[in-house]
Amino acid sequence: MPRSIQLFSASAIVLAGAFLCIYLLTPAFAVGTMITEHPAVAFCAAMVIAGLAWLSLLPILRRFKLSPKISVPAIIFPAVFVLGLLLRILLFGSESVYENDYRRYLWDGAVTANGANPYEYSPSEIYEASKPGASSVPSLARLAVLSNVEADGLTNDINSPVLTTIYPPAAQGVFALAYWIAPFKLWALKLVFLFFELLGLAALLAGLRARGLPLSWSALYWLNPIIIFTTYNGVHMDVLLVAPILSALLWSQRRPIIAALMLSLAAAIKIWPLLLAPVLFRQWRDKPVIYFGIAGLIAVLTSLSLLPMILSLDESAGIVAYSANWVNSSFLFPGVRDALGLFIEDPNRAARYVIAAILTGFSLWLGFITPKDPERVPSHLLLLAAALVFLSPTGYPWYFIWFLMFLPFAVSHWSARGLALLTIGAAAYFARFKMGEAGHYNIYIRVLLPLEFGIPLAVLMWDGLKARSRV
């Protein structure tokens, strides 16, 4: 057996062992337990080991493609698929570690499935209307009954309950599907996420095959511990973006209308994928009728899909509060904000405008200035999505899915090593809770967070300088 295959197998075994440890540790983080008693060090160590095992796959997978002496056994991809699937199923029964966004998903799904508008009332309004003697309009009263009878007080445990939902309509449809399968059951939400992620994996495999790349490179997505853990333990919904975005990538060169439909669907799940459009469709920039037709189609479809959110915008809208005020675990944003604060009165808002301008400019540069070479499209999407994560006011680990979905297409690209390192540093995010409880949150902000993002960024910049002629 070739040494590369042996190393690949060893890495997979270590990854599986680390995940088993993670699973066994999660009951200690159950709701009601004391944060000071949580085994945070052991948990973070297991996450780092899982990240290192996954990272070790990168040079091995490169050799699968680049070395003609290595014959990749046909069993490699099926083994990767089975292992990734088993790790996901393992976490179906785990206790969520420091995350409760899923409560909003469960509630939104119930509201949507019952024919109500999730952007109309906040959970707090519904909770107050459920109290005895409260008077309310009929539609609010109906949701109050739902809260009391079915949700068992869930509305009182949701993050930012005074705000209406932040999640766009297509995401609401997914939440509603989980409700129809099993109302207010977390396993139903995970099952629906798994179904859509399998569609995303199919799009990834089709894209790799279309580009003549090894299917085994899909392991960088399918076995990534951050993707697996934040989706099936933390139950975050960003994995829903993978299928439509990678489908748009698959069809962008041959069937631009289908690609436009897929990108519009992604924007109806989360709005940011619109940033990818100039890169995805740059091959058509010399054909104005097609190019502007694609742009118009995306604009119309996205506007229509987001119309329920747009019509409900006010001070209690989650999307308004998030875009204006939210800052959490951010790396570069605070520096931009503080620098602007030396010159203007509202640096928080100004920093968001500056970062939006930087990202838009980067997207347009990649879309209009760089060569149209279709082989570089995935690596440019990787860089663009990573720039968004580095600059975002919120730097949550589940946002890493935004660029990790493109990594299997860019195994040989200079950016792969630096961006892959973020998977290891993500463990710092989970350390912050116990550190905060112990009064050491400043250590997380001033030491761990800069290390989490700074080391990968330094490696990324170094590798980029060495390959500056190959953007």
What do these predicted regions represent?
Residues 332:
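Short alpha-helix
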Residues 1-327, 337, 345, 349-471:
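Multi-pass membrane glycosyltransferase architecture that uses lipid-linked
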